[in-house]
Amino acid sequence: MPYRRITKDSYWSSSQNSTYNTWVESKTRVAGEHLADADPQYEYAFNSGYNSPPNTRVFGRGTAIFIHCSEPPGNSLGVFTHGCIAIPRDRIVQLLDILDPARHPWCAIGTLEAGTSTSIKAY
């Protein structure tokens, strides 16, 4: 899967303009999440595609739901996110190795209830 490295100037924008819900490189502060502040969680991460193209981004509907490393690495017990999904580092690496944007992968987010995995597999 193609990737880019977070720099000290990397932000995920929540500004109400053309940069809403996109990655922005800026020397000045941008409204939204300063991605470098989430180290080591964002050592490996990807965007689930929530409220992103090909659908039109809708301001106020929320920005990215990232799938990122749990912290401390490899331990998902007692870990909280800001609305993202945290999984062990080795699982993120496995996912990044097999995800292919040309195959249009998608992310199903929900609660684990009886029959849920069967329903998801039906897709």
Predicted regions and their residues:
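Short, conserved phosphate/pyrophosphate- and ester-handling motifs at nucleotide-, phospho-/glycolipid
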Residues: 88
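Short cysteine clusters
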Residues: 84
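Cell wall/extracellular polymer interaction/catalysis modules
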Residues: 1-81, 91-123
